[in-house]
């Protein structure tokens, strides 16, 4: 019987690859199953090719598996966030397996070298997952990879090389340098798992130079606070921490925004009753104007663990505001105001304060700035509160003067007439219209804040998408 030589060679090559894959001695990455009782230390390693190691580490074959992949390290040691994330995962999923992928030796080289090593680390992780699937028939539908910085791209490489697609990859501020313009096969991409979600928290700088990658690389890409920088991470906060804790925490300050991605995910695990919401938007500028607080047709989503796994044809860029510390959730509002009057001057960069009063609490003197204000125009802007004030009942609006001895006090104060203020609450999707408590409210710069209450016409106030 004649056998086509090309077919035979192809079959032999395939068999050779299969046999090589069964030799796992060249895998350098380590896979430690940490426990709820010991989230800090790697006490038990699952070793590819050594079947008894899985039983020895008490691996739960019927539960979810989280694989945590760290990023670049200067010290060659795990960072302090690792046990925090492990503990939070176990608190949310007590019967799960949390495996920390140790690639510390490769991660402590100069950054470009460690960036190149992500391909080998990803290959190691993929071979481990394939072995678990082949040897134990473990369902890859139960596997969730969580990669931080360079670890996010290692997770992407792993996902692209598994025999069956893993359920989910979460990219925690995937690294930017060496990856912003890289091919999809060398970095995290939507093709690497059944669902890929990404948190971008430190994208400040030009593309390719920012610590975190700027472009969307998942099915859903979330940019908290615009993604460039995070509240609580500025120089004033740095000086405060140094005064309290000394210079020993300086490295944490440098990583503050980058690492915020991890803590936002931890927050979603610990505060499951109140998930933060992100909103789909074409740009952060449009989001800052409050134009994107819609939840219709999957336009809003939960942040972190309980995200709705929506796979669109192209990546969804989503935005939200957060607090500077955990819990990070805030409450978003779009405010629209029509400024009427006879003023002929256009005022630029004007500072205002708005106060919100609700059935549960109030949030007073929330500052905002309008780039320009002129008569007979409508302006939309975004504000947020750090507390849930309940259903809105009343507003106050104040136009702030630059100083007591400003030019306006000499030449007469600029004045606008405000009849109605329209507010949309992002979290509840309610639209409310507020009318002046007086017949007409005069908004004067530096003067007392006029009061607005819910309009009596019920048709003006409704729930909307």
From Swiss-Prot:
Q: How does it sit in the membrane?
A: Peripheral membrane protein
Give the UniProt keywords, A-Z.
Answer: Calcium, Cell membrane, Chylomicron, Disulfide bond, Extracellular matrix, Glycoprotein, Heparin-binding, Hydrolase, Lipid degradation, Lipid metabolism, Membrane, Metal-binding, Nitration, Secreted, Signal, VLDL
What positions does the record give for glycosylation?
Answer: 60, 376
Domain PLAT: from-to ranges: 331-454
User: Segment Important for heparin binding: which positions?
Assistant: 420-424
* One Pfam short name: PLAT
Q: What is the active site of this protein?
A: 149 (nucleophile), 173 (charge relay system), 258 (charge relay system)
Instruction: Name the Enzyme Commission number(s) assigned to this protein.
Output: 3.1.1.34, 3.1.1.32
Transmembrane is among the record's keywords: no
> Which InterPro entries does the protein's record reference?
AB_hydrolase_fold, Lipase, Lipase_LIPH, Lipase_N, Lipo_Lipase, PLAT/LH2_dom, PLAT/LH2_dom_sf, TAG_lipase
Kindly list the GO CC terms recorded for this protein.
chylomicron; extracellular space; plasma membrane; very-low-density lipoprotein particle
Where in this protein does the record say 3'-nitrotyrosine is found? 111, 181, 333
Q: Map out region (Interaction with GPIHBP1) in residue numbers.
A: 433-457
Q: Listed disulfide bonds for this chain? A: 44-57, 233-256, 281-300, 292-295, 435-455
Q: Region annotation Essential for determining substrate specificity: residue ranges?
A: 233-256
Q: What molecular function does GO assign, one term?
A: metal ion binding
How does this polypeptide assemble, per the annotation?
Homodimer. Interacts with GPIHBP1 with 1:1 stoichiometry. Interacts with APOC2; the interaction activates LPL activity in the presence of lipids. Interaction with heparan sulfate proteoglycans is required to protect LPL against loss of activity. Associates with lipoprotein particles in blood plasma. Interacts with LMF1 and SEL1L; interaction with SEL1L is required to prevent aggregation of newly synthesized LPL in the endoplasmic reticulum (ER), and for normal export of LPL from the ER to the extracellular space.
Q: Which PANTHER family match?
A: LIPASE, LIPOPROTEIN LIPASE
Q: What's its job? A: Key enzyme in triglyceride metabolism. Catalyzes the hydrolysis of triglycerides from circulating chylomicrons and very low density lipoproteins (VLDL), and thereby plays an important role in lipid clearance from the blood stream, lipid utilization and storage. Although it has both phospholipase and triglyceride lipase activities it is primarily a triglyceride lipase with low but detectable phospholipase activity. Mediates margination of triglyceride-rich lipoprotein particles in capillaries.
Q: Output this protein's name.
A: Lipoprotein lipase
Protein's organism: Cavia porcellus
